[in-house]
């Protein structure tokens, strides 16, 4: 199984830690974020991985080389000249990912022990075009799903803005979830990107919202028996670090 790890972020919310290193190499529980993600993917059967790099990307290349790619096939998608954001980053590596099978996308600043293989199998069984890991957490922006767990919109609860055009959030008919930074994508989504004219630098969430009325984009809630942390900011990094020091494997 194939996976893409997003490691091109600037890590502005982790300064001063990221003044001299890329976000993906900031340590949590004594190991770089990226190492946690790679080892989790490897343990779950994802042994063909591509990692995008941008800010201080040469440090990530050196880190992987020093660890012999952790014994699996790891390639680099070099975005050092221009970061392409999440959607553009996926499209850039389409040739690597597009072999007729779904692939998993994992943000490097998500620390979790969820069942990635199970998420992948659920995606296949549901015949989805994309399956997004989602959870309940405080944020202003939510993805909106119907009671069949199919994406149908987005809302900013602070401003009331809703997407796509014509969508109207109804709490009785919809559930609001926050995106969990991990998703499984089928090659059909890449076809939608190309046919709808998406190219260059773009975020994946606006793309999902643009195709949610014709593509099958599903949500999969985080298992409450598993841990999940967004460690992209200082306070949550410290929380995750404390958790790992006390976590019994």
Where on the chain are the PLM-derived regions?
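Catalytic-core segments of class I nucleotidyltransferases/pyrophosphorylases
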Residues: 102-104, 111, 117-124, 137-138, ...
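A generic "binding-loop/recognition-motif" signal
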Residues: 10, 21, 56, 80, ...
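Glycine-rich N-terminal loop/short-helix segment of MobA-like nucleotidyltransferase
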Residues: 2-28, 42-44, 222
């Amino acid at each position: 199984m194939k996976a893409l790890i997003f490691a091109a972020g600037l890590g502005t919310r982790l300064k001063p830690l990221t003044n001299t290193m890329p976000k993906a190499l900031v340590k949590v529980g004594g190991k770089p974020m990226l190492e946690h993600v790679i080892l989790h993917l490897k343990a779950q059967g994802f042994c063909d991985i591509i990692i995008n790099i941008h800010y201080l990307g040469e440090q990530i290349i050196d880190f992987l080389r020093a660890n012999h790619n952790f014994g699996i096939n790891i390639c680099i998608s070099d975005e050092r000249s221009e970061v392409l954001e999440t959607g553009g980053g996926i499209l850039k590596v389409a040739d690597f990912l597009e072999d007729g099978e779904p692939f998993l996308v994992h943000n490097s600043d998500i620390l979790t022990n969820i069942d990635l293989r199970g998420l992948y199998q659920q995606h296949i069984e549901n015949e989805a075009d994309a399956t997004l890991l989602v959870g309940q957490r405080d944020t202003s922006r939510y993805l909106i799903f119907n009671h069949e767990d199919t994406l149908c919109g987005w809302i900013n609860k602070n401003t009331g803005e809703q997407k796509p055009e014509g969508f109207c959030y109804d709490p009785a008919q919809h559930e609001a979830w926050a995106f969990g930074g991990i998703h499984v994508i089928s090659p059909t989504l890449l076809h939608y990107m190309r046919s709808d004219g998406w190219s260059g630098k773009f975020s994946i969430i606006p793309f999902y919202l643009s195709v949610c009325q014709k593509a099958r984009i599903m949500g999969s809630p985080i298992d409450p028996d598993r841990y999940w942390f967004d460690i992209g900011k200082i306070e949550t990094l410290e929380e995750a670090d404390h958790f790992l020091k006390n976590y019994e494997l």
